[in-house]
Amino acid sequence: MANNRAVRVGEQMKKELSDILIRDIKDPRVRFVTVTGVDVTGDLQQATAFITVLGDEEERKATLAGLEKAKGFIRTELGKRIRLRKTPELSFSFDESIQYGNRIESLLRDLNKNDSNE
């Protein structure tokens, strides 16, 4: 079972990270980013932020590069907003679950079309 404190810190980090990306990041590569979740380790030392990006593969790579470049600033801002002894080390990862869900939905839709045509 996940540590309750880690879950609460992850949820708070998700809210603050979304706000930071919308209001404070000025990098033009970091646009149309949605934070879908944040996993924090039990010792609160590391956090993985799962993001989705609206756009093609090239825009996704550029966004990830922009986030990696701004990682220090983002961590500093999180430290100011969330009262923790040590701000977790951030890493960013693409959330593939939305694309996976869309693919399954389109396959099911195609199956339903084929069944209704027969």
Swiss-Prot record:
Its main location: cytoplasm. One of its GO terms (cellular component) is cytosol. GO terms for molecular function: ribosomal small subunit binding. It comes from the Bacteria. It is found in: Cytoplasm. InterPro entries: KH_dom-like_a/b (IPR015946), RbfA (IPR000238), RbfA_dom_sf (IPR023799), Ribosome-bd_factorA_CS (IPR020053). PROSITE patterns: RBFA. Keywords: Cytoplasm, Ribosome biogenesis. Pfam families: RBFA (PF02033). GO terms for biological process: maturation of SSU-rRNA. Monomer. Binds 30S ribosomal subunits, but not 50S ribosomal subunits or 70S ribosomes. PANTHER family: RIBOSOME-BINDING FACTOR A, CHLOROPLASTIC-RELATED. Belongs to the RbfA family. One of several proteins that assist in the late maturation steps of the functional core of the 30S ribosomal subunit. Associates with free 30S ribosomal subunits (but not with 30S subunits that are part of 70S ribosomes or polysomes). Required for efficient processing of 16S rRNA. May interact with the 5'-terminal helix region of 16S rRNA. This is Ribosome-binding factor A. The lineage of its organism: Bacteria, Bacillati, Bacillota, Bacilli, Bacillales. The gene is rbfA.
